[in-house]
């Protein structure tokens, strides 16, 4: 009889172990009737990981303080720390765990009655804006949607196996987290506003090129993709300990008013090594533009602001009378123009790289007035025209990248038409854009010459055309009548989008006039 071969267990790598923990946690969550798909599961997993991450970091800092003979104040007091209620596998579970997390007042893990976990975390505050404020902001809009306390205990036990004190594990988890954000965007379907393709983010940050010592802002931070990329870009410039210290303090700033993206953004930045994320949880457009002064300005803005949405009437009061619009992309463009630092000592001043829909390029009326200010007072030096489907299947609206600084006025605008890979007609969810595809554009960027992909238009020509920035490639041979059906459909879609914008503007006028 031939002896059976025993299967040799191959030790899992750190990446495989972490992937296994995350996947196991998500499988457990699928059994809970309170959760409905990845749109519920990822935020749930995020706040659990956030508390474990925080406790691991606190224990490291506490030990460092002891060795240095210094006092250490914990951000979270007992019995609300992870180590108090979550780290023991046989700890609080079932209905008691749900009650402890959800209720304003509950029996705590130490047996005493007091504030529930979320109620306590939301009440945290500090005098100098430390982690306690960050924690309170994170949990202000966070909800525990799991209803089975036994399943929740199983998830907590899984997450307890992640060691956030290991740099390798944090790096790996950061990558895993990005893949989960992509899945969340996929699950969101038409409302997938959380994720800008990483290759596009990397290209924008690469050409805007933030330098150590500069301040960087994303006024529509979402899940923090631009800030993470800017952090990685700046981290490579750090040569000394002091450099890294300055990078961590006051360099990166984001604004994200929606509770879910705010939580995801905080976690994304923490996992990538940003120790004190400075994310404002309120509306970026809440201040009158005229009140924005030098102290509010920054060196670099990289962003993909929302477009197609509408803002409340109170927000529109913050904008000049002749530039009020229902188009959020145009509102953010005006904000960005005010937020860029003025030139000092021969510098170009603040600079920006941002995503805009085609409607911004060809829009007239209020849109044209905003663009005229951009051309006359800023240096709009480059527009990169993106190919079809960069954001597919979430939107088919054609998009562009604007690059400008405060060294204006504009003399001419360079256009670069980013092509699709050879043989491709579109990007798709399974075959998205890759960073390597920007290699030719990056090579062209510093040695600009006209070519079949690049051309320039004088500002006089642009102003004479009513600030129409929607300039076609003069080398293009296709006539619209001979375009493929798919591209014709997109051209029609572009015009439909413009009609929607005009109708939104008419609606705004009717509301403001009280008609």
Please describe what each predicted stretch is.
Residues 32-35, 312-328, 358-366, 386-394, ...:
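Short, contiguous acidic/charged loop-to-helix segments that flank catalytic cores in large enzymes
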Residues 41, 204, 257-262, 325-403:
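Conserved Class I SAM-dependent methyltransferase catalytic core
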Residues 379-380, 392-440:
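C-terminal, active-site-flanking charged/polar segments
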Residues 190-303, 308-310, 324-326, 330-331, ...:
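Conserved S-adenosyl-L-methionine
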Residues 1-212, 278-289, 385-390, 411-419, ...:
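Non-catalytic, mostly N-terminal accessory regions of nucleic-acid modification and defense proteins
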Residues 14, 85, 170, 178-182, ...:
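S-adenosylmethionine
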Residues 15, 145, 166, 220, ...:
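Hydrophobic alpha-helical scaffolding
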């Amino acid at each position: 009889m031939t002896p059976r071969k025993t299967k040799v267990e191959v030790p899992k790598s750190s990446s495989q172990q972490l992937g296994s923990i995350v996947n196991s946690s998500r499988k457990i969550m699928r059994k809970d009737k309170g959760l409905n798909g990845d749109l519920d599961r990822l935020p749930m997993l995020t706040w659990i990981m956030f508390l474990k991450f925080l406790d691991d970091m606190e224990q490291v800092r506490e030990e460092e303080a002891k060795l240095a003979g210094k006092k250490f104040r914990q951000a979270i007091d007992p019995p609300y720390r992870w180590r108090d209620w979550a780290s023991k596998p046989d700890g609080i579970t079932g209905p008691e765990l749900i009650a402890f997390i959800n209720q304003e007042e509950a029996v705590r893990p130490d047996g005493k009655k007091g504030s529930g976990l979320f109620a306590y975390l939301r009440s945290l505050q500090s005098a100098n804006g430390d982690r306690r404020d960050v924690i309170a902001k994170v949990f202000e809009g966070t909800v525990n949607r799991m209803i089975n306390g036994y399943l929740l205990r199983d998830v907590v036990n899984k997450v307890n196996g992640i060691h956030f004190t290991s740099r390798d594990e944090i790096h790996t988890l950061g990558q895993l987290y990005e893949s989960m954000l992509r899945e969340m965007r996929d699950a969101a379907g038409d409302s997938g506003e959380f994720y800008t393709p990483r290759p596009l983010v990397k290209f924008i940050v690469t050409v805007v090129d933030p330098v150590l010592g500069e301040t960087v802002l994303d006024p529509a931070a979402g899940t923090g993709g631009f800030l993470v990329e800017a952090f990685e870009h700046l981290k490579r410039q750090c040569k000394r300990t002091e450099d890294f210290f300055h990078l961590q303090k006051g360099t990166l700033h984001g604004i994200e008013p929606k509770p879910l993206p705010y939580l995801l953004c905080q976690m994304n930045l923490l996992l990538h090594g940003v120790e004190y994320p400075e994310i404002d949880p309120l509306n970026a457009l809440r201040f009158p533009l005229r009140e924005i002064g030098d102290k509010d300005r920054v060196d670099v803005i990289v962003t993909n602001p929302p477009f197609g949405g509408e803002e409340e009437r109170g927000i529109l009061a913050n904008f000049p009378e002749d530039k009020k619009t229902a188009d959020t992309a145009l509102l953010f463009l005006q904000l960005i123009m005010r937020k860029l630092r003025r030139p000092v000592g021969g510098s170009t001043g603040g600079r920006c790289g941002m995503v805009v829909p085609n409607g911004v390029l060809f829009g007239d009326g209020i849109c044209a007035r905003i663009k005229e200010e951009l051309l006359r007072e800023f240096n709009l030096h480059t527009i990169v025209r993106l190919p079809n489907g960069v954001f597919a299947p979430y939107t088919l609206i054609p998009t562009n990248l604007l690059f400008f600084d405060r060294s204006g006025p504009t003399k001419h605008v360079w256009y670069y038409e980013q092509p699709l890979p050879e043989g491709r007609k579109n990007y798709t969810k399974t075959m998205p854009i890759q960073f390597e595809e920007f290699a030719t554009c990056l090579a062209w960027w510093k040695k600009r010459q006209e070519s079949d992909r690049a051309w320039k238009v004088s500002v006089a020509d642009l102003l004479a055309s009513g600030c129409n920035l929607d300039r076609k490639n003069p080398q293009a041979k296709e006539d619209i009548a001979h375009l493929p059906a798919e591209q014709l459909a997109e051209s029609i879609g572009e015009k439909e989008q413009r009609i929607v914008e005009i109708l939104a503007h008419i609606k705004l006028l009717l509301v403001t006039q009280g008609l």
